[in-house]
């Protein structure tokens, strides 16, 4: 199976240690990669592609969101593909960056009455799918992406994040 070269950076926030985040992220994304290869026939390069995960706070992600998306507010996760990829096409050697905000993640998890780690898992899967060109702007795209998220999370032993909950509007690219 294709492994990922995951680079972790904890910038701000009350996150677990980098070692804990590395272990959790590796487990989550290995399952996600295996799913995409088996179920979506997603090709991967022979050499492990690099992925940057940045764990930060609401203030930092708000600034990034304002600069890159013209939305001056914090969000839970942002994804920045290194190269444009559409689902099913070969990604480059660098997948891109996923940035997660601690306070927003913590607040949303509490609102949904879900464990912090479970919501973090969902956000990492969500952000990772964005790096492969999946999106949720149009209803049909959102339905496809949410279906993939639900199936991947099921492989990780987690319930459907959209089942009984209203869709979180802040899940953004």
From Swiss-Prot:
Q: Which InterPro entries match?
A: MetalPrtase_cat_dom_sf_prd, YbeY, YbeY_CS
Annotated keywords = Cytoplasm, Endonuclease, Hydrolase, Metal-binding, Nuclease, Ribosome biogenesis, rRNA processing, Zinc
What's in the GO CC field?
Answer: cytoplasm
Q: Give the molecular function GO annotations.
A: metalloendopeptidase activity; RNA endonuclease activity; zinc ion binding
Q: What is its main location?
A: cytoplasm
The UniProt record gives the binding positions of Zn(2+) as: 126, 130, 136
**Which PROSITE patterns has this protein been placed in?**
UPF0054
Cofactor dependence is on: Zn(2+)
EC number per UniProt? 3.1.-.-
Q: Where in the cell is it found?
A: Cytoplasm
What GO terms in the biological process aspect are recorded for it? rRNA processing
Cofactor: how bound: Binds 1 zinc ion.
Record's family? Belongs to the endoribonuclease YbeY family.
> What biological function has been recorded for the protein in this entry?
Single strand-specific metallo-endoribonuclease involved in late-stage 70S ribosome quality control and in maturation of the 3' terminus of the 16S rRNA.
- The name on file for this protein is Endoribonuclease YbeY
Q: Which organism is it from?
A: Sinorhizobium fredii (strain NBRC 101917 / NGR234)
